[in-house]
Structure formats: structure tokens, C-alpha cells
Curated annotation (Swiss-Prot):
UniProt key word Magnesium: yes
Catalytic activity: alpha-D-glucosamine 1-phosphate = D-glucosamine 6-phosphate
EC main group: isomerase
A GO biological-process term: carbohydrate metabolic process
PTM notes: Activated by phosphorylation.
Organism this protein belongs to: Nocardia farcinica (strain IFM 10152)
Annotated protein name in UniProt: Phosphoglucosamine mutase
Function noted in UniProt: Catalyzes the conversion of glucosamine-6-phosphate to glucosamine-1-phosphate.
Length: 458
């Protein structure tokens, strides 16, 4: 068995590589590691609406309860909501069943530790070791975990706030988002593409509660249509809708709503780098940007670094994945970080990327300044970037192949100071990602094509 955990949990083809049996073993191992030594341990379980979620939730619940941990299901909610509620309800772990932006046939298991924090590598290694050993601890009798509702959880001595019920988790999360926004959004009209995913209910509700006029699209999940030509990886629909409705902006989420990309009134795309630039400058002005520092990943465009330098903001760089962004935020005491893909983390309000909160904060900046999104995003001039995703059978071996490393070194020498190259295995899919940035867009296209051709040949 290869490594189970990727950049963001365990993912695979539902009922294929991600089988119910594997889901049971992973959740049982997680319960042993994260629930060890805790009496009346509680796990929260949520999911996105893809069809396989119900099957995998049943398997995860079986694994957790078989390990002696009680389970509280919060139903279909965004990943950041599950993380937030894990902390709010004082659970020893939370589980989100989702493959995020991946196609519907895939699914995944994201695990949060107490407080809603993502797992570090050492904890993942301990869970993987238990899965590989396949010798689970199995209590009997009263030691078996129970599947609880809110009142039942309180009857078992678990910490579920009296004013909240499982049925009210959506409302509580929306309240949390609106409180964090801190500004009335009346007068702004937004098109929200919910990707037929976990944001379909809470996304439009939060934007409306904050005062905005909301036009929701792709907000009718049926289990099969999640991410199907919509959401943050397919922006054509939201771009058209913004122009057709004369909206001030559009916001696009992915299947589990932990990311957000934006569209200006003219239909132009505002990516995660531009969103980070706008929010970092806003927080610097308000004194909320700790140490005048933004945390970004190696995938962020060179243009972000140049824009932040001009604004007097330092940039700390991490590996790809919002878990690594969060680790750097916590280690340095910083207050804003994120990725070009639209994961933005506000550690004051949550422990993972939150797409809906990102959209609310972006709109709050528009309301505060009275400026259009295109005007605000103009602070960043993107250096031409080409990203090619190359399907391969063994992503780690191909990315580390001597021929590939030599070709990358040659291309870097050719670019000199006028660009950069990043070639890495995807953390979530069987792909090698080839990214080339260069002030000469023709040069960027050619180098990316040459490297992608080499990768595909191996």
C-alpha cells in the first residue's frame, strides 16, 4: 500500500481505491490516535452532497464507533464549517467526506484534530501505520461508540452548547460568517456559483444575511452534478451570469466550499493571488495584518510578490496546500495566508481555507472603499504563467526522474531572472504539474510545452 494521505487528506475513486473498507480502517485508526485517553470522546462527521458520501459516511461512522468514539453527524456542510464546529463542540476529531474540486466519482476523507486543526505529518504517519497494521482496538459492551443527536450527546456528558442543535449547525455557521464579515453589504449584487456542492445552502444564506443581493447558480445538488462544468474550476457560467445580470461581482466555490475565486463586473477573473493582494492591503490599513506579512505558497505568481513589496508587505512562502499555509500562520503569528487556487485562511476566524468567508471579506472591502473589484484587483499585475497538468502513472517517480530534473535546470538557466519554473507531483491527483512564469509569454508557453512533453513520455 502506498502513502494514503496526500496534500489534503485521503482521496480516490469512491468504491474503488477509496472503498468503504478503507474508510472504516482510516477512521478507526484516526479515532485511536486522536481519541486516545479521552473519555466520552466525540467526533463530528460532515460531507459534501456527492452520491458516494452517504456510503462513506456510514463506513466512517462504523470505524469511529467501533473504536469507541461517539459520532455526531452534521450532514452536508462546507469543510470549513466542519472544522469550525469541531472546535465549537469540543470534539476530539472531525471528519469531512469530500473530494473538494475533484469530479463526482471521486471522494475523500479529511480529518481534523481537536480545535478543528488539520493533521501534521507525524499524526498522519501514526494513522497510516495503524491502517497498515490492520490490528484495531475494538472495545465491547458499553465501550462501543454511539451515534448521537445533540440532546443525546448532552445526555452522554459531551459538550454540545445548549443553544445549538444539529439541525441548527447551518444557521450557527452562517452567524459565524456574518459576524466575521464586520460590514453591511447592502447595495452590492453578487452572483454565487455553488458548484452544486456543500455551499449550496449556506453560501447564498450568508451573503444574503450580510445584506447583499444574491443570484445563486448551480445551487441544486443532486449527488451527481457536483463540480460538473461549474464552480471554481469552471468559471464560464459565473462570468456570463455576472455580465448578464449586471452584478457587481461573481464568486465561485468548489465542491466543499473551502476555496473562492472571483469575477469582476466585466467578467474578468480575479484569482486567489489577486484576492490575497486586495485583502492583505486592506488588513494592513486596518492594522489587522500581523507583522505586515502575508503567507503564500510556491504556486503564487511572481506578480503577487512584486505587488506586496510595493505595498510594504512581506511574503512568507510555503509548500502547496492550505495545511502548510496554516502551519506557517500559526508558527509566525501571522493573520492572513492563502493560495492562488482560492484557499484563503483567516486564523482569527477558522483553521482552514474558507471560501464563503473569503467572498464576504472581499465584498466588505468593496463596500468600505466604494471601489469596483476590478479597480481593487488592479494592484496586482500578473507575470505570464503557464500551468500544464500532465497525467502520469507514478507522479513521484516521474517528477524526480534525472532527465526531468536536468531539463528543469536547463530551462531555469535559460530564463535567468526573468521567470521561474515549478515542477511537482500533485498532492491530490495522479498528475505532475508543470508551471512556468516568464516576462515573455511565448517563452513561458514553449518551455512549459517542452517540459510537459518530456514528463508525458516517461
Amino acid at each position: 500500500m502506498g502513502r494514503l494521505f496526500g496534500t489534503d487528506g485521503v482521496r480516490g475513486l469512491a468504491n474503488g481505491s477509496l472503498s468503504p473498507e478503507l474508510a472504516l480502517r482510516v477512521s478507526g485508526a484516526a479515532a485511536q490516535v486522536l481519541g486516545r485517553g479521552k473519555t466520552r470522546a466525540l467526533a463530528l462527521v460532515g460531507r459534501d452532497p456527492r452520491a458516494s458520501g452517504e456510503m462513506l459516511e456510514a463506513a466512517v461512522t462504523a470505524g469511529l464507533t467501533a473504536a469507541g468514539v461517539n459520532v455526531l453527524s452534521v450532514g452536508v456542510l462546507p469543510t470549513p464549517a466542519v472544522a469550525y464546529l469541531t472546535g465549537l463542540y469540543d470534539a476530539c476529531l472531525g471528519v469531512m467526506i469530500s473530494a473538494s474540486h475533484n469530479p463526482m466519482p471521486d471522494n475523500g476523507i479529511k480529518i481534523f484534530a481537536a480545535g478543528g486543526h488539520k493533521l501534521d505529518d507525524a499524526v498522519e504517519d501514526r494513522i497510516e501505520a495503524l491502517v497498515a497494521a490492520d490490528d484495531p482496538v475494538r472495545p465491547t459492551g458499553a465501550g462501543i461508540g454511539r451515534v448521537l443527536n445533540a440532546s443525546g450527546a448532552r445526555d452522554h456528558g459531551l459538550h454540545i452548547p445548549d443553544q445549538y442543535s444539529v439541525e441548527g449547525t447551518h444557521e450557527r455557521y452562517v452567524e459565524h460568517l456574518v459576524e466575521a464579515t464586520g460590514r453591511d453589504l447592502s447595495g452590492l449584487t453578487v452572483v454565487v456559483d455553488c458548484a452544486n456542492g456543500a455551499a449550496a445552502e449556506v453560501g447564498p444564506a450568508a451573503y444574503r444575511e450580510a445584506g447583499a443581493t444574491v443570484i445563486a447558480i448551480n445551487a441544486e445538488p443532486d449527488g451527481l452534478n457536483i463540480n460538473d462544468g461549474c464552480g471554481s474550476t469552471h468559471l464560464d457560467q459565473v462570468r456570463r451570469a455576472v455580465v448578464e445580470h449586471g452584478a457587481d461581482l461573481g464568486l465561485a466555490h468548489d465542491g466543499d466550499a473551502d476555496r473562492c475565486l472571483a469575477v469582476a463586473a466585466d467578467g474578468s477573473v480575479v484569482d486567489g493571488d489577486a484576492i490575497l493582494a486586495v485583502l492583505a492591503i486592506a488588513m494592513k490599513e486596518s492594522g489587522e495584518l500581523a507583522q505586515d506579512t502575508l503567507v503564500a505558497t510556491v504556486m503564487s505568481n511572481l506578480g503577487l510578490h512584486l505587488a506586496m513589496r510595493a505595498a510594504g508587505i512581506a511574503v512568507r512562502t510555503t509548500a502547496v496546500g492550505d495545511r502548510y499555509v496554516l502551519e506557517e500562520l500559526r508558527a509566525g503569528g501571522y493573520t492572513l495566508g492563502g493560495e492562488q487556487s482560492g484557499h484563503v485562511v483567516f486564523p482569527k476566524y477558522g483553521t482552514t481555507g474558507d471560501g464563503v468567508l473569503t467572498g464576504l471579506k472581499l465584498m466588505a472591502r468593496m463596500a468600505q472603499t466604494g471601489r469596483s473589484l476590478a479597480d481593487l484587483a488592479g494592484v496586482l499585475t500578473t507575470v505570464p504563467q503557464v500551468l500544464v497538468n500532465v497525467p502520469v502513472s507514478d507522479k513521484a517517480a516521474v517528477a524526480a526522474a534525472p532527465d526531468v530534473r536536468e531539463a528543469v535546470a536547463d530551462a531555469e538557466r535559460e530564463l535567468g531572472d526573468s521567470g521561474r519554473i515549478l515542477l511537482r507531483p500533485s498532492g491530490t491527483e495522479q498528475l505532475v504539474r508543470v508551471m512556468v512564469e516568464a516576462t515573455d509569454p511565448v517563452k513561458a508557453e514553449q518551455l512549459a510545452a517542452d517540459l510537459a512533453k518530456l514528463v508525458a513520455s516517461l
